[in-house]
Amino acid sequence: MSLEPVYKRVLLKASGEALMGGQGFGIDVTVADRIASDIAEARHMGVEVGVVVGGGNIFRGVAVASKGGDRVTGDHMGMLGTIINALALATSLRKLNIDTVVLSAISMPEICESFSQRATLYHLSMGRVVIFAGGTGNPFFTTDSAAALRAAEMGAEAIFKGTQVDGIYTADPKKYPDATRLDRLTHQEVLDRGLAVMDVAAVALARENSIPIIVFSIHEKGGFAEILTGGGLKTIVSDN
C-alpha cells in the first residue's frame, strides 16, 4: 500500500448518528474527537477535505411528517440539527489545530459563514477543512443529496460515505452473518438493485458528475486515512 494518498480532494459524508456513539441522542464528544482525528490525519497527508454531517442524532424532518405535521418545517428543524453537528465537529478539529470553517446553506452570519462555491474553493486553497452545514438549504432533500451536490461543486475526486459497516453487503451483515461485502459496483447497479448506500437522487447526481462513492466504516479509527492511500476495507461505486 502506497503511503501517498490516491485522492487529493474528497468529500466525507458522516451521518448524525455516527456522532452519537453509544448514546441514544445528541453528540458524544469522544466520538466527535475521534472522527476529527481521522480528518486531521487526512489533512496531514495533504488531502483537501470537505465534510457533510447529517442531523439524525438531533432531529429528523420526516418524523414531523409521519405525525401529521408540516414536512417543510420538520426539514428546517433537521437542517438546524446539521448546523449543531457541524459546529461540534469544527470544535473538535480546532482542538487539534486544524484550520476549519463551517459554511451554512442557511444564512446565520453571527454563527458561521454562508455557503458559496467561491468561498468553498477559497477556503480549500488555504488548507482549511470545510464543513458544509444546513443540507442543501431546501426541504425534501437529504444530507446525502447535499453531499453529492457539494462534492460536485467543490470538484471532489470521490465521496467517502462513512457508515456503520465496512462497505456494501449482499444483505444486512448484522442480521445475516453469511452476507458478503461487495468490492465494486457501478452507480447504475446501486440504483437498479435498490441498495441503501445513499438515496437515489444522491447516487444519480454522483453518477452524472462521474464522482465515485467509497463506502467504509466511520467507526474504524484510522480507516479514513488508510482508504485514502488505497488500502482498507471498502466498497467502491464507480463507472470507471
UniProtKB/Swiss-Prot annotation:
It catalyses: UMP + ATP = UDP + ADP. Transmembrane segments: none annotated. Gene3D superfamilies: Acetylglutamate kinase-like. Keywords: Allosteric enzyme, ATP-binding, Cytoplasm, Kinase, Nucleotide-binding, Pyrimidine biosynthesis, Transferase. GO terms for biological process: 'de novo' CTP biosynthetic process; UDP biosynthetic process. Pathway: Pyrimidine metabolism; CTP biosynthesis via de novo pathway; UDP from UMP (UMPK route): step 1/1. Its EC number is 2.7.4.22. GO terms for molecular function: ATP binding; UMP kinase activity. It comes from the Bacteria. Allosterically activated by GTP. Inhibited by UTP. Coiled coil: none annotated. One of its GO terms (cellular component) is cytosol. ATP binds at residues 13-16, 56, 60, 163-164, 169, 172. Residues 21-26 are annotated as: Involved in allosteric activation by GTP. It is found in: Cytoplasm. UMP binds at residues 55, 75, 136-143. Catalyzes the reversible phosphorylation of UMP to UDP. Belongs to the UMP kinase family. HAMAP family: PyrH_B. Homohexamer. This is Uridylate kinase. It comes from Rhizobium johnstonii (strain DSM 114642 / LMG 32736 / 3841) (Rhizobium leguminosarum bv. viciae).
